[in-house]
Amino acid sequence: MTLAKIVFASMTGNTEEIADIVADKFRDLGVEVDVDECTTVDAEDFLEADIAVVATYTYGDGELPDEIVDFYEDLAGLDLNGKIYGVVGSGDTFYDEFCKAVDDFDRCFAATGAEKGSECVKVDLSVEDEDIEKLEAFAEELVAKAN
């Protein structure tokens, strides 16, 4: 059975909701899913998964959230060849660097040798119906790439 690992950072609950939507779709598609908050796991846990997903918010003027910086740095040192990855997240279009943390994780994953399974999904603040559709399509694309 395909295993997806989702690691998230969430301050307001918006990004955790994003992670849960993706996880629910994975389960609907018959994928085993582990969902964990970024401070409770190690980046090396992605080595056990077929699909690796990070869900993060962007803090302030484009910074990674403090709580996910160590995870990000550890991820950069991994060899994830043969893995499929995807990145989703929330931000605020009020800022010039909308969802920059999503872009940062996208580049970080690419440097690990993992294969990008879907375009990143960026949500403005909280999840709307159109975002749910994009997040579910994101999950479907990752599963299709992994199988």
Model-identified regions with their sequence ranges:
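Aromatic-flanked redox-active Cys/Sec active sites in thiol-based oxidoreductases
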Residues: F8-T12
